[in-house]
């Protein structure tokens, strides 16, 4: 048979066809004879070529042919722009200095053009804003209607992202959507989901190349400026999260900082730039040490010079007097939190040195006094507006202060500890999630201080009522007479520190 000629069609017997073996077409065929089978040809020949189209197949083909670009009106949003606008305006007015990465006017324009990616980003931002202001004891300042607060912005964001298959083509918008979903989830206390969203944002940023300086060379000035802000915002957020949740740091401080000359709101960005410095001064290796602080790995003695350098550079962080209170609170708390962590790692590695101010045992006592002096004019609302992260940082500063007091036996630090505890307790009255172990440790330290003061008063001639026969400490502490010195008949107030300064 010639090479290009097609073999004739054959029809094997029923048995060979069923067994899917070659039939020699004899009657009966040799395989049926060999296997003692009846050789028949009774099966009905099936129709060749295309069959009748099924309704389900027709519908699938129609859906495929009608599929449009995600930016068209094939996606039907559940929320109109008027439902998104209150949260977007709150971001523009109050939170741009914290997350200076979005132009609300540009976002609104894209949403009106049915851009699904912009709509998903607006939903994520709205969820983040609502969960952020939920911690504020009096959030009437933000004027968000009650019906808007009840909307499921996270669910709608996920629906929009699923429609556009966002993972296939990472963009700055998809990065920011993942970031604001992280903010929304962390404020709800959903730590695993929050970590996953932040890691997703970081991965997409690396795919785009935000961690490489070469990426910015071919970009227009405005776009490159925004990209740098996004990268540093991710870096700051990741470094806090990694200490909070003991997860390894990924992002390096690997690109040039952004310029204030390229920014429309330079006052707000100046504060953000100082915040970036707070988290950039310690290297990634130092952050790894922060995370491993509970491990037995020790740092070499020469590291003390590096830790001292970090403390001095953190000391140089300054804040513009015209910066918003929310931004001031964020920067000041972050700065002293980082200084407290640096002292803590110094102590953990036995590198304390009383001849170096920043490395001495009493340094946290000095830090706490400076910290309280810097925040005295900042309203409580500014701390609340920064979300639960501010409480975590305050507790870290306070526990480091307790370590310093215990090591130095310097009770002068108790006044600062009480004032910090007062601030934390006020924040605790909101819906913020308080790390219980650290909170209880501060409470126990202050209780011990009160007992020491009471017994000291007794030894100096003050009146101490008898403890009940069962030795109840509660009975002792609740007896009002322990607060007075002098005679039982005419008690006079003893030393009670004024912690409400």
Swiss-Prot record:
Keyword DNA-binding recorded: yes
UniProt entry keywords in alphabetical sequence: Activator, DNA-binding, Metal-binding, Nucleus, Transcription, Transcription regulation, Zinc
Listed transmembrane segments: none
Location(s), subcellular: Nucleus
DNA-binding region: 13-39
InterPro entries from the UniProt entry: Carb_Metab_Trans_Reg, Transcription_factor_dom_fun, Zn2-C6_fun-type_DNA-bd_sf, Zn2Cys6_DnaBD
GO BP terms: DNA-templated transcription; maltose catabolic process; positive regulation of cell adhesion involved in single-species biofilm formation; positive regulation of cell-substrate adhesion; regulation of transcription by RNA polymerase II; single-species biofilm formation on inanimate substrate
MF GO annotations: DNA binding; DNA-binding transcription factor activity, RNA polymerase II-specific; zinc ion binding
Signal peptide: none
GO cellular component: a single term: nucleus
Primary location class: nucleus
Described function: Affects sucrose utilization and alpha-glucosidase activity. Probable transcriptional activator.
UniProt family annotation: Belongs to the MAL13 family.
Protein name, per record: Probable sucrose utilization protein SUC1
Organism: Candida albicans (strain SC5314 / ATCC MYA-2876) (Yeast)
